[in-house]
């Protein structure tokens, strides 16, 4: 059953049962003091409301029959998957750079099985959800995401998570290139860096690659009364 979500730059209509909510990298690394972003000098002091908003959005999406996909960014304990000096990721990943500057952190940041890699305690995948590891910013790179979506007839993706200007935007952009419709819930995301990075990412998304809405509006669009209005 179709519903219409009020968004910028215009409303978008979708069928929740042929849509997915993508939760990007809600790991201790990105959302918890003592995690990678915090240790690398990024401000994570305002992530708690984002976690609560994601909880709300996921609950509404699951109740409406949307597929929930959780991403965890990181690599094996030896960081082979991160790439060596021949990879730009080796030079640009702030996690890898932080560990080179602080060798005592080696093996602790974004390593699979570590506390840093784990999802935050408040966000727990449920049976029927899909949890995917990803080795780079985009959730489409070297993962089965596109085939998972296409095999289920899913074309509309609703994004939440961290960081808006890095992994969220990268995944939404790649989805756009693969003919997926991407919506980001702005109050269920958080940037890495200054506030202008959040504003710039949202501007890019709503102007060039997708749509921007918020959690309250999203939940309202999934309510039974909204389906009744469309019907």
Curated annotation (Swiss-Prot):
Ordered alphabetically, the record's keywords are:
Hydrolase
What is expression of this protein induced or repressed by? Answer: Up-regulated by the nitrogen regulatory protein C (NtrC also called GlnG) and repressed by RutR.
Q: What is its EC number?
A: 3.5.1.110
Per the record, the domain of life is Bacteria
Q: Which Pfam families match?
A: Isochorismatase
Q: What's the protein here called?
A: Ureidoacrylate amidohydrolase RutB
The active site of this protein is located at 25 (proton acceptor), 134, 167 (nucleophile)
Q: Return the similarity comment.
A: Belongs to the isochorismatase family. RutB subfamily.
């Amino acid at each position: 059953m179709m519903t219409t979500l009020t968004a910028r730059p215009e409303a978008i209509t979708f069928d929740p049962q042929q849509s997915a909510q993508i939760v990007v990298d809600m790991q201790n690394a990105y959302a918890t003091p003592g995690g990678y972003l915090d240790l690398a000098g990024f401000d994570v002091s305002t992530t708690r409301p984002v976690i609560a908003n994601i909880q709300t959005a996921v609950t509404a999406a699951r109740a409406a029959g949307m597929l929930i996909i959780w991403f965890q960014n990181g690599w094996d304990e030896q960081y082979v998957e991160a790439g060596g000096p021949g990879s730009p990721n080796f030079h640009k990943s702030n996690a890898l750079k932080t560990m080179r500057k602080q060798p005592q952190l080696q093996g602790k940041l974004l390593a699979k099985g570590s506390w840093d890699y784990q999802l935050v305690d408040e966000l727990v995948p449920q049976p029927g959800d899909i949890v995917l590891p990803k080795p780079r910013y985009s959730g489409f790179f070297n993962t089965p995401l596109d085939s998972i979506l296409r095999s289920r007839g899913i074309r509309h993706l609703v994004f939440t998570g961290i960081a808006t200007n890095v992994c969220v935007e990268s995944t939404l952009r790649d989805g756009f290139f693969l003919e997926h419709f991407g919506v980001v819930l702005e109050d269920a995301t958080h940037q890495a860096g200054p506030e202008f990075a959040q504003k710039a990412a949202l501007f890019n998304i709503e102007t060039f690659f997708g749509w921007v809405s918020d959690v309250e509006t999203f939940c309202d669009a999934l309510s039974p009364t909204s389906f009744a209005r469309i019907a």
